[in-house]
């Protein structure tokens, strides 16, 4: 049975951690990122919402842990999204998925330890090789790396009871319209659809009050 709107919880402080999927690709307007749409849906229910996007383009999961986690903890949020790992694959000729898993485990562990009541959400990574212009050897490396990355993300999320949005297995992951000109970063359509999935998950898994849909 779905929780009635009057019984749903309000988010007071939302912090978004991650790479360019959170921070926005270079040139992306600061109000056009998927956490921005998520915050907009939350603010419709609670106009007093505080929203902090700490994401940075080009960072690995270890760099998220090293540079973004401490400021996040200092803000004492009741909702945190952590979406990262793509750069662990794209920026290395030998993707170190164990390093990603170790860093993600550390992030989730610290958040659970310091903020036991926080709502935590992460996501898998769409198959980046689908739309990137890559040579065969690089395509295999990226394809295999993303598969292993997502396996690790799911495993760590499950261990820490973190809701994991399935962007990797979503039919939209193969639709070109959901990606920008570079074939890597999401398009405006893709961003809005990702935010819509996030809003639905907040309502379903946490009983968090939002607008019904992303505007």
Regions found by a protein language model. Name each.
Residues 25-26, 62, 91:
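Short N-terminal helix/helix-N-cap motif within the alpha/beta-hydrolase-1
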Residues 46, 66-215:
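Alpha-helical cap/lid subdomain in secreted, periplasmic
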Residues 19, 32, 62, 177, ...:
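Flexible, active-site-adjacent loop/turn segments at secondary-structure boundaries
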Residues 56-61, 141-142:
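Short, flexible loop segments at the rims of nucleotide/cofactor-binding pockets, characterized by
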Residues 1-57, 67-76:
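Serine-esterase "nucleophile elbow" of acetyl-processing enzymes
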Residues 22, 60-61, 81, 124:
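Ser/Thr-centric signal marking residues that sit
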